[in-house]
Amino acid sequence: MRLRNKPWAKDKIAAYPQYVIPDPETKRGRWRELFGHDQPLHVEIGTGKGKFITEMAKLHPDVNFIGIELYPSVLVSALDKLIESGLANVKLLNANAKDLTAFFADGEVSRIYLNFSDPWPKKRHEKRRLTYRDFLALYDRILAEDGDIHLKTDNQSFFEYSLVSLSQYGFVLASVQLDLHQSGMTDNVMTEYEEKFSAKGNRIYRCEAVRPPRRSS
């Protein structure tokens, strides 16, 4: 993905600390206090321009949402949507997924969304894939006992890799859809990428994976 540089993006993000949390480490274990509601916490990793997370937040006011995006030039579009909507149950982080355990306490998150993650197709880049075992270990820590991962992609190879990686780690595949838009699922919220790829006729793959039983220390 080629990113359009927006030199002003960081300054705009910094101007809205009520939406893009500047010090997420200080909220670890206390996100429900920040939101002001004791509701389930759902996290989207790679929130992009924010269409998915803002629409989900509108549909589910009884859930608190956090969108994580590494690139300021992309996150600023999600910020614009959040400012316009005025949603109180969404916060954003300009952060790296490698730092998840610094932001969230063990068992604090109920669900993780991985929507159209970079597939990093070259073998030498395997460790960068968001379903590589090192990332799964982070998800395992922050997810609640009955927490789960919802994944969508149009990349068949990445999907197959993810199914194997999740299974080998111990996640239970509760749902696997090889053609989401022909599956009859009625409550699917599409991302920007999903709209683009499905319009081209690309098949969309989806799975739900439940975290393994908590390992005893």
UniProtKB/Swiss-Prot annotation:
GO MF annotation, one: tRNA (guanine(46)-N7)-methyltransferase activity
Region span, Interaction with RNA: 124-129
Active-site residues (renumbered): D118
Pfam families: Methyltransf_4
EC number: 2.1.1.33
GO CC annotations on file: tRNA methyltransferase complex
Residues annotated as binding S-adenosyl-L-methionine: E44, E69, N96, D118
PROSITE patterns to which the protein is assigned, alphabetical: SAM_MT_TRMB
Biochemical pathway: tRNA modification; N(7)-methylguanine-tRNA biosynthesis
Domain of life of the source: Bacteria
Alphabetical UniProt keywords: Methyltransferase, S-adenosyl-L-methionine, Transferase, tRNA processing
Residue sites binding substrate per the record: K122, D154, T191, E192, Y193, E194
Catalytic function, reaction form: guanosine(46) in tRNA + S-adenosyl-L-methionine = N(7)-methylguanosine(46) in tRNA + S-adenosyl-L-homocysteine
Protein family according to the UniProt entry: Belongs to the class I-like SAM-binding methyltransferase superfamily. TrmB family.
Record's function text: Catalyzes the formation of N(7)-methylguanine at position 46 (m7G46) in tRNA.
Name of protein: tRNA (guanine-N(7)-)-methyltransferase
Gene name per UniProt: trmB
